[in-house]
Amino acid sequence: MTSATIPGLNGTDGTPPTQHKELLAWVQEVAELTQPDRVVFADGSDEEWDRLTTKLVEAGTFTRLNDEKKPNSFLGNSDPSDVARVESRTYICSKEEIDAGPTNNWMDPAEMRTLMGDLYRGCMRGRTMYVVPFCMGPLDAEDPKLGVELTDSEYVVVSMRVMTRMGSKVLDKLGTDGFFVKALHSLGAPLADGQEDVAWPCNDTKYITHFPEDREIWSFGSGYGGNALLGKKCYSLRIASAMAHDEGWLAEHMLILKLISPEDKAYYIAAAFPSACGKTNLAMIQPTIPGWRAETLGDDIAWMRFGEDGQLYAVNPEFGFFGVAPGTNWSSNPNAMRTIDQGNTVFTNVALTDDGDVWWEGLEGDPQHLIDWKGNEWTPESGTHAAHPNSRYCTPMSQCPIMAPEWDDPKGVPISAILFGGRRKTTVPLVTEARDWQHGVFMGATVGSEQTAAAEGQVGTVRRDPMAMLPFLGYNVGDYFQHWIDLGKSADASKLPKVFYVNWFRRGDDGRFLWPGFGENSRVLKWIVERIEHKAAGIDTPIGVVPTGSALDIDGLDVSDADITEALAVNIDEWKAEIPLIEEWFDFVGEKLPTGIRDEFEALKQRLA
């Protein structure tokens, strides 16, 4: 099939909706390779949403939910083999292997292009190829970060409408020669003439590949989330982190929170936590201390750059939330529930109730019968998860009742504090303030979480996840640490955000949590704000500054003084045991570990001696 015979390649009326020569040439090249039945330029309209969601319902991919419960919302259940990001099949194909570094899978880019080119050949037969123009961050930014995803998945098109600024207005912004990231995606499930489709097409062979120097993403075989919605982790973190390194900014796996004091002063906080450490819950926190309020600007990704005034400003490049459903409820995260309840949401791999609503583990209610995420009848006696542990909601940010008005401001917001955190039962106190920027980078470089189940590795083993970026770095981790240090050195030290390390998950000897977490974490945020204002007391310890017992506002909190003391304790023996674990991690990072990080490590060892 030649390009001339592919319907839609030149628009519906023979005139392409863009005059961007490079884009049109790329669309034609990919269409000739993948051989779709037709090409459609996505416009992001309500009519398109209605048409594609109806098509997905008719295909059995989507179930339309009860409009009275979840208006304009849908449930999709994936193939059981396609339920999460696949780190083992995710590649950073830099020109030189050293530039991918020890934390990434690497293949020679020419070899990968040949391998994937063979997979792409004819892979869209029987399907429509959609051209999805999108923008990460506000479209009216000074330098908007544009992309175009080519995909044969309607699920991707409707999800990208929620997660990004997408459609005709982005094509207009591209003009005739604007730069864009090329993002190619296929389910890898061609259809022969007359072949019946399956509800969730995918391929056992999967690749999620990034070419950082070329700013390109190639994804094959998966229809799921971060593997297929290429604006999210692939562009906004892996490719953007490489762009940020080259251009002098930061692309980080961070929430952005606005905390407002009783005096009505706003503080903006960015925080990086690995998965299962409460990032979305903190992003949407309801403070429990009187007079304090919180608003959110994002729960997952922050792009940060220095403004003309020397302060570090952050924007959230996303347009929607792609949150983990299990554990989300009216107690743990009421604002997420209020966002979802307004509808316009795509759910994936949650359970379906008898009245056409959704349910997952941890949600209020005690259903006696459900259709589970695999499409099977489910009762409490089934002994299986009704919803997949990584099931998701994809919902517009604009629906969140506590979105800060400035969330869509291309200038961003000035960051006062950066938080790093992991899930540690021992060793790491509730909150520690770094001595300075470089010490803060050392803290971020050593973030880790204990493995929680034998299936994930030995229980208690610390999995390092530097700045919560381990799965998302687009280049060498050592160069990444150096980039953080360099940005700090080139900035006005008095205007740099203060850096803190938090750990909501410390446990007592009997295994119970010492700190209640959730909304009570606002008490820790209050201490952080008071440290920024030079008002709160702290104790200098070998690992940094921790609050005095009296400096933390625990008024009205039902936690014993002994538990607070233990949560804040710096146990020298535990930290001495941590040293060889950090050494092992730094050995893995290898020759590119910055001297500044090594200096901080040696200083810590001396303070512990």
Swiss-Prot record:
Where do the catalytic residues lie?
Answer: 277
CDD domains, per the entry = PEPCK_GTP
Q: Where does GTP bind?
A: 276-281, 392, 423, 518-521
Cite the InterPro entries for this sequence.
PEP_carboxykin_GTP_CS (IPR018091), PEP_carboxykinase_C (IPR013035), PEP_carboxykinase_GTP (IPR008209), PEP_carboxykinase_GTP_C (IPR035077), PEP_carboxykinase_GTP_N (IPR035078), PEP_carboxykinase_N (IPR008210)
Keyword field: Cytoplasm, Decarboxylase, Gluconeogenesis, GTP-binding, Lyase, Manganese, Metal-binding, Nucleotide-binding
Q: What is its EC number?
A: 4.1.1.32
What is the protein name stated in its UniProt record?
Answer: Phosphoenolpyruvate carboxykinase [GTP]
UniProt gene name: pckG
